[in-house]
Protein backbone atom coordinates (compact mmCIF):
# COMPACT_ATOMS: atom_id res chain seq x y z
CA UNK A 1 0.00 0.00 0.00
CA UNK A 2 1.37 3.41 -0.98
CA UNK A 3 2.21 5.76 1.86
CA UNK A 4 -0.15 8.69 2.22
CA UNK A 5 1.14 11.96 0.76
CA UNK A 6 2.08 14.45 3.51
CA UNK A 7 -0.60 17.13 3.27
CA UNK A 8 -0.62 20.58 4.88
CA UNK A 9 -3.39 23.14 5.22
CA UNK A 10 -2.17 26.44 3.76
CA UNK A 11 -4.16 29.56 4.60
CA UNK A 12 -3.99 32.21 1.85
CA UNK A 13 -4.93 35.72 3.01
CA UNK A 14 -4.65 39.34 1.93
CA UNK A 15 -6.85 42.17 0.71
CA UNK A 16 -9.35 41.56 -2.08
CA UNK A 17 -7.93 42.17 -5.54
CA UNK A 18 -4.32 41.34 -4.66
CA UNK A 19 -4.34 38.29 -6.95
CA UNK A 20 -4.73 35.42 -4.48
CA UNK A 21 -7.20 33.47 -6.62
CA UNK A 22 -5.21 34.13 -9.80
CA UNK A 23 -2.11 32.83 -8.00
CA UNK A 24 -3.65 29.61 -6.74
CA UNK A 25 -5.36 28.90 -10.08
CA UNK A 26 -2.00 28.80 -11.87
CA UNK A 27 -1.50 25.23 -10.62
CA UNK A 28 -3.66 23.33 -13.11
CA UNK A 29 -4.10 20.08 -11.18
CA UNK A 30 -5.15 22.00 -8.08
CA UNK A 31 -7.61 24.05 -10.14
CA UNK A 32 -9.09 20.89 -11.67
CA UNK A 33 -9.45 19.11 -8.31
CA UNK A 34 -10.54 22.05 -6.13
CA UNK A 35 -13.47 21.59 -3.76
CA UNK A 36 -15.93 24.25 -2.65
CA UNK A 37 -16.87 24.37 1.04
CA UNK A 38 -20.20 26.17 1.11
CA UNK A 39 -20.34 26.48 4.90
CA UNK A 40 -17.26 28.70 4.92
CA UNK A 41 -17.48 30.06 1.37
CA UNK A 42 -14.02 28.67 0.64
CA UNK A 43 -12.39 26.94 -2.30
CA UNK A 44 -9.74 24.38 -1.32
CA UNK A 45 -7.13 23.75 -4.01
CA UNK A 46 -4.95 20.64 -3.52
CA UNK A 47 -1.55 21.71 -4.89
CA UNK A 48 0.85 18.80 -5.30
CA UNK A 49 4.62 19.11 -5.70
CA UNK A 50 7.23 16.41 -6.43
CA UNK A 51 10.23 16.65 -4.12
CA UNK A 52 13.44 14.68 -3.71
CA UNK A 53 11.74 13.15 -0.64
CA UNK A 54 8.54 12.20 -2.50
CA UNK A 55 5.22 13.95 -3.07
CA UNK A 56 3.97 16.76 -0.85
CA UNK A 57 0.60 18.47 -0.99
CA UNK A 58 -0.66 21.86 0.14
CA UNK A 59 -4.42 22.17 0.58
CA UNK A 60 -4.64 25.88 -0.20
CA UNK A 61 -7.68 27.59 1.30
CA UNK A 62 -8.82 30.51 -0.86
CA UNK A 63 -11.51 32.87 0.42
CA UNK A 64 -13.30 33.27 -2.92
CA UNK A 65 -13.49 37.03 -2.34
CA UNK A 66 -15.36 37.17 0.96
CA UNK A 67 -12.53 39.18 2.60
CA UNK A 68 -14.00 42.19 0.78
CA UNK A 69 -16.87 42.12 3.30
CA UNK A 70 -14.76 42.33 6.45
CA UNK A 71 -12.67 39.82 8.38
CA UNK A 72 -12.68 36.08 7.85
CA UNK A 73 -14.26 33.65 10.26
CA UNK A 74 -12.03 31.64 12.56
CA UNK A 75 -13.10 28.45 10.80
CA UNK A 76 -11.03 29.58 7.85
CA UNK A 77 -7.86 29.65 9.96
CA UNK A 78 -8.40 26.71 12.32
CA UNK A 79 -5.84 23.91 11.84
CA UNK A 80 -3.84 26.03 9.40
CA UNK A 81 -0.28 24.69 9.28
CA UNK A 82 1.28 27.40 7.13
CA UNK A 83 0.24 30.66 5.50
CA UNK A 84 0.78 33.06 2.63
CA UNK A 85 -0.07 36.74 3.09
CA UNK A 86 -0.40 38.53 -0.23
CA UNK A 87 -0.36 42.21 -1.12
CA UNK A 88 -0.26 44.07 -4.42
CA UNK A 89 2.97 46.02 -5.11
CA UNK A 90 0.92 48.53 -7.14
CA UNK A 91 -1.34 49.34 -4.16
CA UNK A 92 0.11 50.78 -0.94
CA UNK A 93 -3.05 50.20 1.08
CA UNK A 94 -2.84 46.43 0.51
CA UNK A 95 0.63 46.49 2.11
CA UNK A 96 -0.55 48.73 4.95
CA UNK A 97 -3.16 46.06 5.76
CA UNK A 98 -0.61 43.21 5.96
CA UNK A 99 -0.21 43.57 9.78
CA UNK A 100 -3.97 43.08 10.21
CA UNK A 101 -3.89 39.84 8.21
CA UNK A 102 -0.84 38.68 10.13
CA UNK A 103 -2.55 39.40 13.44
CA UNK A 104 -5.67 37.44 12.45
CA UNK A 105 -3.61 34.53 11.16
CA UNK A 106 -1.32 34.24 14.19
CA UNK A 107 -4.17 34.79 16.67
CA UNK A 108 -5.68 31.47 15.58
CA UNK A 109 -2.71 29.58 14.12
CA UNK A 110 0.00 30.98 16.40
CA UNK A 111 3.56 30.10 15.40
CA UNK A 112 3.21 28.69 11.87
CA UNK A 113 5.60 29.34 8.96
CA UNK A 114 4.35 32.28 6.88
CA UNK A 115 5.48 33.75 3.56
CA UNK A 116 4.72 37.35 2.62
CA UNK A 117 4.28 37.81 -1.15
CA UNK A 118 4.25 41.06 -3.10
CA UNK A 119 2.25 40.24 -6.24
CA UNK A 120 1.99 41.99 -9.62
CA UNK A 121 5.70 42.78 -10.05
CA UNK A 122 5.07 42.44 -13.80
CA UNK A 123 3.31 45.84 -13.65
CA UNK A 124 5.79 48.64 -14.32
CA UNK A 125 4.15 51.19 -11.98
CA UNK A 126 5.37 49.63 -8.75
CA UNK A 127 4.24 51.65 -5.70
CA UNK A 128 5.50 49.47 -2.80
CA UNK A 129 9.28 49.64 -3.06
CA UNK A 130 11.82 47.23 -1.56
CA UNK A 131 12.97 49.66 1.15
CA UNK A 132 9.43 49.98 2.52
CA UNK A 133 8.87 46.20 2.75
CA UNK A 134 10.12 45.55 6.28
CA UNK A 135 7.21 43.79 8.01
CA UNK A 136 8.57 40.31 7.25
CA UNK A 137 11.86 41.15 8.96
CA UNK A 138 10.09 42.23 12.15
CA UNK A 139 7.97 39.10 12.30
CA UNK A 140 10.53 36.61 10.96
CA UNK A 141 8.57 35.80 7.80
CA UNK A 142 9.99 34.94 4.39
CA UNK A 143 9.38 37.43 1.56
CA UNK A 144 9.13 36.98 -2.22
CA UNK A 145 8.26 39.26 -5.10
CA UNK A 146 5.87 37.29 -7.32
CA UNK A 147 3.86 37.73 -10.49
CA UNK A 148 0.93 35.34 -10.60
CA UNK A 149 0.08 36.15 -14.22
CA UNK A 150 3.59 35.39 -15.47
CA UNK A 151 4.28 32.46 -13.08
CA UNK A 152 7.34 34.39 -11.82
CA UNK A 153 8.55 32.87 -8.51
CA UNK A 154 5.37 30.74 -8.31
CA UNK A 155 7.13 27.83 -6.59
CA UNK A 156 9.31 29.87 -4.20
CA UNK A 157 6.74 30.30 -1.37
CA UNK A 158 5.79 26.61 -1.52
CA UNK A 159 9.40 25.43 -1.50
CA UNK A 160 10.26 27.59 1.52
CA UNK A 161 7.16 26.39 3.39
CA UNK A 162 7.80 22.74 2.48
CA UNK A 163 11.33 22.95 3.88
CA UNK A 164 10.05 24.48 7.11
CA UNK A 165 7.21 21.97 7.52
CA UNK A 166 9.36 18.93 6.73
CA UNK A 167 12.26 20.38 8.72
CA UNK A 168 14.83 19.81 6.00
CA UNK A 169 16.55 22.54 3.98
CA UNK A 170 17.86 19.91 1.54
CA UNK A 171 14.33 19.44 0.19
CA UNK A 172 14.05 20.42 -3.48
CA UNK A 173 11.26 20.33 -6.04
CA UNK A 174 12.33 17.82 -8.69
CA UNK A 175 9.59 18.34 -11.27
CA UNK A 176 7.67 21.49 -12.07
CA UNK A 177 3.88 21.27 -11.67
CA UNK A 178 1.74 21.97 -14.72
CA UNK A 179 1.09 25.71 -14.65
CA UNK A 180 -1.34 27.76 -16.70
CA UNK A 181 0.34 29.59 -19.61
CA UNK A 182 1.57 33.07 -18.65
CA UNK A 183 -0.73 35.97 -19.46
CA UNK A 184 1.93 38.55 -18.58
CA UNK A 185 5.69 38.81 -19.00
CA UNK A 186 8.21 40.01 -16.44
CA UNK A 187 11.23 42.06 -17.41
CA UNK A 188 14.12 39.90 -16.18
CA UNK A 189 16.47 42.89 -15.84
CA UNK A 190 13.89 44.65 -13.70
CA UNK A 191 13.46 41.50 -11.57
CA UNK A 192 17.25 41.44 -11.01
CA UNK A 193 17.09 45.09 -9.98
CA UNK A 194 14.24 44.35 -7.54
CA UNK A 195 16.21 41.43 -6.08
CA UNK A 196 19.26 43.63 -5.58
CA UNK A 197 17.09 46.29 -3.92
CA UNK A 198 15.58 43.71 -1.54
CA UNK A 199 19.08 42.43 -0.66
CA UNK A 200 20.24 45.99 -0.01
CA UNK A 201 17.14 46.80 2.05
CA UNK A 202 17.73 43.69 4.17
CA UNK A 203 21.01 45.20 5.38
CA UNK A 204 19.37 48.45 6.52
CA UNK A 205 18.27 49.00 10.13
CA UNK A 206 14.56 48.59 10.72
CA UNK A 207 12.56 51.83 11.08
CA UNK A 208 11.43 52.93 14.53
CA UNK A 209 8.07 51.70 15.77
CA UNK A 210 6.80 55.29 15.90
CA UNK A 211 7.36 55.96 12.21
CA UNK A 212 4.14 56.52 10.30
CA UNK A 213 5.30 54.38 7.41
CA UNK A 214 6.58 51.73 9.80
CA UNK A 215 5.55 48.46 8.19
Swiss-Prot record:
One of its GO terms (cellular component) is nucleus. Disulfide bonds: none annotated. Its main location: nucleus. GO terms for biological process: protein import into nucleus; ribosomal subunit export from nucleus. InterPro entries: P-loop_NTPase, Ran_GTPase, Small_GTP-bd, Small_GTPase. One of its GO terms (molecular function) is GTPase activity. SUPFAM superfamilies: P-loop containing nucleoside triphosphate hydrolases. Keywords: GTP-binding, Nucleotide-binding, Nucleus, Protein transport, Transport. It is found in: Nucleus. Residues 34-42 are annotated as: Switch-I. GTP binds at residues 15-22, 65, 119-122, 147-149. It comes from the Eukaryota. Residues 4-168 form the Small GTPase Ran-type domain. Found in a nuclear export complex with RanGTP, exportin and pre-miRNA. GTP-binding protein involved in nucleocytoplasmic transport. Required for the import of protein into the nucleus and also for RNA export. Involved in chromatin condensation and control of cell cycle. Belongs to the small GTPase superfamily. Ran family. This is GTP-binding nuclear protein GSP1/Ran. It comes from Neurospora crassa (strain ATCC 24698 / 74-OR23-1A / CBS 708.71 / DSM 1257 / FGSC 987).
Amino acid sequence: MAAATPTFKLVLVGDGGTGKTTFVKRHLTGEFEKKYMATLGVEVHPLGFSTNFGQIQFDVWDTAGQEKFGGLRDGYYINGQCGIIMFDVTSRITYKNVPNWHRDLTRVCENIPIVLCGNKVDVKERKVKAKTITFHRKKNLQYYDISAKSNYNFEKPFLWLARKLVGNNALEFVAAPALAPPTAVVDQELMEKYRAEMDEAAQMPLPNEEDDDDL
